[in-house]
Design a protein with these regions (language model features):
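Core segments of cupin and vicinal oxygen chelate
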Residues: 7-48
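A cross-family glycoside hydrolase active-site/sugar-binding cleft signature
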Residues: 6, 51, 68-70, 94-95, ...
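Vicinal oxygen chelate
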Residues: 82-122
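Long, continuous compositionally biased terminal/linker segments
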Residues: 41-85
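Short glycine-enriched loop/turn motifs at secondary-structure junctions
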Residues: 1, 60-64, 100
Length: 122
């Protein structure tokens, strides 16, 4: 359904460090910067990208919005969460763990305040 997701960030260096670490914990390669100062994480199934807002205003997290990534195991989900905390992220929602008997979730806010999570289907 999606070709790409692009998040607004305020500090590209801090955000790239955060996403290189968290997406690296999920098995993805570090992001690649383009000539316009945007950062791209490309996969065969889609693109995740970071950009400083073009209008010059501060990037803000979407109120009520969350971007979710898949984790192959609960251990990978926990490693993702820890990598985020160690690289400028903050925890949000409940601690990482099962939600009912169907999924395992972990939530973070990135350095720009965007809410992201990983989901592992149990």
């Amino acid at each position: 359904m999606y070709s790409h997701v692009m998040l607004g960030v305020n500090d590209m260096e801090a955000s790239k460090q955060f996403y290189d670490a968290t997406l690296g914990a999920l098995g993805y390669e570090p992001g690649v910067m383009d000539k316009k100062g945007r950062c791209f994480y490309r996969t065969p199934k889609g693109v995740f990208a970071l950009s400083v807002p073009l209008d010059g205003k501060p990037a803000t997290g979407a109120n009520g919005g969350t971007i979710g990534f898949l984790a192959k195991t609960t251990e990978i989900a926990d490693a993702w969460h820890q990598a985020g905390l160690e690289n400028g992220g903050t925890t949000c929602e409940d601690p990482p763990g099962p939600r009912g008997d169907v999924m395992y979730l972990a939530y973070l806010r990135d350095p720009a305040g965007n809410k992201i999570c990983v989901l592992h289907k149990l």
